Structures are given as C-alpha cells and as structure tokens.
C-alpha cells in the first residue's frame, strides 16, 4: 500500500494512542511526512516548521537530532543532513518520539535505535543517544553508600548489633513494624543512650520516654541496641523493626557567628564611591551595606538612572544579580545596553556566563526613582570595605555535614528572634527541626511549599503560613533562616535540624499534583527510589513512609507513617501504594493521603541506584 509514514514528537503528557488515526499535530505535536513527500508540520504554538526532507523508502535510515535546550530539530537521511526541520520548539515541556502510519492502511515495521547498539552513522557533534548509558556519571554511584534501610526481627538479646550498612550512620530513624510503638530518632551530634531519642509522632522533649528504647552506639557499619528498663520497642522478641540511616560526614564542627562573612561579602573596595548622580534621600552606602531592607532614592527625573560604574570594570565568572525590595516599576540597564524589569522583593540575574561589568543602572517610571537594595557578583554581595555588614551566620551552631550526599545535622541554641544558622551543604530544599527541651511540634520546611510556609511532621495538618518560622527566607548555600517562633527558635533552648539538599541521581525533593486515579501521576526523580516519603501539603494527610526493603516488588504496599505510632499495614495493591521505578515513582491509589484530585503533595526521596544504572525490577 501507500507509504504514509509520519515521524514526529508529541508532548510527554499527550493523550495520543497509536491506532486511533491521530496524527501528532492533533495532540500538540509535530511531524515529518517521510513516507510521502518529506513535508513538515507543527501544531499551533508547538514549533515553527522549516525545511522539508527528502522522501524516505524502505531501508533508508532516518537520523533525528533534537536540541531540547534551544528548541531545534534536524533530520538526516542515511547520514546526510536534511537541513533544519523545526525551530522554536517548546522548551517548557517534555517531548516523546513517535512514529505512525497516517491512515493505518499499511503493515510496516519500524526499527528504532535509541543507542542500545552502535549507530549506522556517526551522531552530530554535541548530541547524545537517548539512552541511560549516555547520562552523566552520578556523583553517588550506589545510594547505599550514603543512605540505606535495614530490617530485623527482635530477639530480646543484648547488646544487639544491627550491621550491614556501607557507612557509619549519623542519623538513624527506627520504627517497630509489628506493634504500635513510637518512632525513635538519634543522631551523632546529640549522641546515643536512653535519654537522647526523639519521636517523630510525638511533641515530647528529648528523652522523655527514655525507658523504652536504647541505642548505645553508632558503629562503623551499623548501630547497637541495648537493654531497657521498660518495654523494648526496638528488639522485642516476636516483633519486626525497620531502620533508615543517613551518612552525615565524619566529624562535628563548630561554626561561629560571622565565620562565613568572607564567603558572602566582597569588601575589596568602597563601592559606594563609584556611583552617580547623588540621591536626595539616603546615600549610596545603603546599596552596599549588606542590608536588603535599606535603599537610596529620589533626586533624578523619572526614567533617569542611578548608575554604578566600578573602576576598571568588575570581572565575574558566573553571574551578576540585583536585589529590588518592596518598590514597584523598577528596571535596570546593564553595561549601557541590556535592559529588563526588576520585580519587587526578589533577585534578578542581569548577566551570566562570565564577563566584565562596566556599568549597572537602575531607574523607575515615576519621579520617586529608587536605586538598588543590593548587588551580588559571583555569589557575593558587594559591601563597602569600611562597612560592618550583618554576620553570616548570625548565631553559632554545631554542624555535622556530608556535602557530597546533601545531608547535615545542625544544633544551635535558640535566640527567640530572627537569626541565620549555618548548615554545611548546598542550599537545603527540605529541613526537619525539633526543639529538644520543649514539648512542641516538629517543624519542617520544604522548597515546594515556599519558605513562608511550614508543615508539622507529627500531625496530619495542611501547610501553615507564618513569617515567624523561616522568616520568609529561602535557605541559601551558607545558611537557613529562623525567626521568633518558639517551635523552631526558642530563646535559650537547644534545637536540632536535619537538612537535605538535592544530589542529582541520588536525592530529590519536590511536589506533584494528585489526579484521584489509581493510574496516578508519575514523579521523575532521576533514580530508582530506595525510600519515599509523601505528604499532602495543600490539604490534611498522613506522612507516608515507603521503602523497597520492606516492599521489594511493585506495588510498594507496606506502609508506616511518620506522624503515627501505628504498626505497619500491607495494603497489597490498594490504598497508599506506589510503584518504585528506575527513574522515579508513580502513585497507584486514589486515597486522600496520596493522590486526591487537585491536591498538592510534597515528596522526599533517596536512591538505591541512579537512573543510569537502574534496571527494571
């Protein structure tokens, strides 16, 4: 029959189904009509169609070179370029390769090589095969070297050593699976023993329930459980227990107030002396004092610029950013050319990739022109050399950090007022905190809900909003912020924090939107999960704890909950279940605590293997 073969791409979330006579453009995609005349077409808004290709016959080899970053597509026939078939391809969505016979009238076999074997023709320069072998090598090749899960059966024999970890654990989180006993958390900063454990399902202060659990040591490849005066909730005969463990580095470090100033500020000059014209309200020093709430203003006409002209130019290797506070209608001009708006209360990147800044001007479209609140070059605020900026961090802390695994343990004494605390890793996306001496809630922060909001780990509550918790400030690569809340920063009392930053192909912290179906949303993590914790953030819901040690095949159905002492429940394909896949996880139930339609859920996940080496299970 006639050859009506179409080769194309469709959006990753498309409803396209082979055999239903749909062509890619009907579902927001694009195609090349290789079987008939080589014509090209794209759905409205999907791409701009360009050069047609030659016609392909049986035995011809089509090359498909898609540049997802720049939104271009070039085809090759038997190794010869056919020009550029598409430009301006949407870069804000995922794309899936597809091939179809337009009218389903022909019987055809398509052999597609995504890199599983050698190509017949050399791929264009800077293009990679669409297969996991082409992925970059992961920082952590084996997730069990930084995080792992262990299970054991109690035997009421002491001391009981739990071994088999590939690291010395610095945080352990333990839960009896058989009985409704409390969770137990211990770490290398606070130490071990009956008076040192905390429970994620209780507001109790440290060690209040000391008689029921006793971890006597954190060892080279595990930990040791000791005897107790009360009911042993960790090694009782006839019960099963699970333990999750993280590697937090090798030693505790005291980080003094102000000890990170040189990492945060560039004080190599009096920058305020390199600006013009003079403002009538305030001085240029307010743009170079390290304070993001002060600003200079007025004295120039609307549309005129306050301009910073660094002597000899200021070279940079990464980026230049400007902070604009609570002032609307401001804009910038960089090096006398590039212009752009400056949204209120936010940083705006004005240059990237390296270069020399010779001038930076800020203006406003009204007479009351305001200047910049701060300028940052290569991650450091420009601060006058004769100014004393705020200390970073503002208070001291004890930190045990494993930057390569994106995990740290932090302990500090609360101040009862706004403060910054050092954490020792890349900017955390998830933080768990607990006041040690007070019966208060566990407070968590998650990047997906914003740092003006919080969740309690020990309750099912939806997210709450309060500037008194994280001071409406996202963590950066040096510190996280706390405010006046007695939950997180009680004056004179110690607080512990567990901080997590994402490491590509090892850990992921994000969110997904529920669809209310057993065919739930897929969440890409970039690895096969070993551990997944989920929680409804926009509505009430449980903190679900999954791992592939307890559920070693899909669906992962054996559930515990961080906010509950309940024993493990095996839902065997029903409520709460997920599939753990080679590159993420997928909700397989519509229960309200996992996948209600229209509800937003946060997740925290750690890898068994990176996507590059993960295989189907």
Predicted regions, residues:
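A short beta-strand element within beta-rich, extracytoplasmic domains
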Residues: 1, 174, 291, 299-327, ...
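Surface-exposed molecular-recognition determinants
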Residues: 2-3, 9-268, 272, 291, ...
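Disordered, acidic Ser/Thr/Pro-rich linker "stalks" and the adjacent N-terminal cap
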Residues: 18-22, 258-311, 334
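Extracellular beta-strand-rich recognition modules
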Residues: 320-324, 358-365, 587
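Extracellular ligand-binding interfaces
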Residues: 323-342
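Extracellular carbohydrate recognition and processing domains
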Residues: 338-354
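Short acidic/polar inter-strand loop motif in beta-rich domains
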Residues: 367-370
């Amino acid at each position: 029959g006639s050859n009506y073969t179409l080769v194309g791409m469709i959006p990753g979330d498309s409803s396209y189904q082979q055999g239903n006579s749909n062509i890619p453009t009907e579902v927001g995609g694009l195609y090349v009509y290789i079987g008939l005349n080589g014509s090209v077409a794209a759905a409205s808004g999907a791409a701009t169609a360009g050069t047609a290709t030659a016609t392909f016959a049986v035995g011809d080899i089509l090359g498909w070179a898609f540049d997802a970053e720049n939104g271009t597509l070039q085809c090759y026939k038997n190794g010869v370029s056919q020009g550029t078939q598409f430009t301006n391809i949407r870069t804000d969505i995922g794309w899936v390769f597809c091939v179809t016979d337009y009218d389903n009238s022909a019987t055809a076999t398509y052999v597609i090589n995504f890199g599983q074997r050698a190509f017949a023709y050399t791929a264009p320069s800077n293009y990679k095969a669409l297969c996991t072998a082409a992925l970059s090598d992961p920082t952590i090749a084996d997730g069990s070297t930084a995080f792992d899960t262990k299970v054991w059966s109690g035997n009421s024999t002491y001391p009981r050593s739990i071994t088999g970890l590939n690291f010395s654990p610095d945080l352990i989180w333990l839960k009896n699976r058989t009985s409704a006993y409390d969770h137990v958390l211990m770490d290398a900063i606070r130490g071990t023993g009956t008076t040192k454990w905390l429970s994620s399902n209780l507001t109790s202060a440290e060690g209040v329930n000391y008689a029921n659990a006793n971890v006597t040591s954190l060892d080279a490849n595990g930990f040791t459980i000791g005897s107790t005066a009360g009911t042993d909730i960790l090694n009782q005969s006839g019960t099963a227990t699970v333990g999750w463990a993280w590697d937090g580095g090798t030693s505790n470090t005291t980080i003094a107030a102000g000890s990170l100033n040189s990492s945060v500020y560039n004080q190599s000059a009096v920058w305020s002396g390199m600006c013009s014209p003079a403002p009538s309200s305030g001085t240029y020093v307010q743009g170079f004092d390290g304070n993001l709430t002060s600003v200079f203003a007025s004295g120039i006409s609307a549309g005129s610029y306050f301009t910073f002209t660094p002597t000899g130019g200021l070279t940079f290797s990464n980026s230049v950013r400007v902070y604009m506070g609570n002032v609307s209608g401001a804009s910038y001009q960089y090096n006398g050319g590039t212009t752009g708006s400056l949204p209120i209360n936010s940083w705006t990147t004005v240059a990237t990739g390296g270069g020399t800044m010779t001038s930076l001007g800020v203006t406003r479209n009204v007479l009351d022109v305001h200047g910049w609140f701060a300028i940052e070059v290569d991650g450091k605020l420009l601060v006058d050399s004769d100014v004393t900026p705020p200390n970073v961090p503002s208070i001291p802390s004890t930190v045990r950090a494993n930057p390569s695994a994106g995990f740290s343990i932090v302990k500090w004494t609360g101040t009862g007022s706004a403060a910054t605390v050092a954490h020792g890793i890349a900017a955390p996306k998830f933080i768990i905190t607990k006041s040690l001496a007070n019966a208060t809630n566990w407070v968590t922060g998650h990047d997906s809900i914003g740092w003006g909001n919080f969740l309690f780990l020990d309750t099912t509550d939806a997210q709450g909003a309060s500037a008194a918790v994280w001071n409406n400030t996202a963590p950066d690569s040096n510190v996280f912020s706390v405010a006046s809340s007695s939950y997180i920063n009680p004056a004179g009392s110690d607080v512990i924090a567990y901080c997590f930053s994402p490491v590509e192909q090892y850990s992921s912290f994000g969110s997904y939107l529920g669809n209310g179906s057993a065919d739930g949303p897929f969440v890409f993590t970039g690895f096969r999960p070993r551990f997944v914790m989920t929680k409804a953030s926009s509505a009430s819901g449980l903190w679900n704890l999954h791992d592939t040690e307890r559920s070693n095949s899909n669906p992962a159905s054996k559930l515990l909950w961080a906010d509950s002492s309940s024993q493990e429940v095996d839902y065997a394909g029903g409520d709460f279940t997920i599939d753990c896949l080679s590159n993420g996880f997928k909700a397989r139930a519509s229960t309200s605590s996992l996948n209600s339609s229209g509800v937003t859920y946060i997740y925290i996940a750690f890898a068994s293997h990176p996507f590059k080496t993960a295989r189907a299970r």
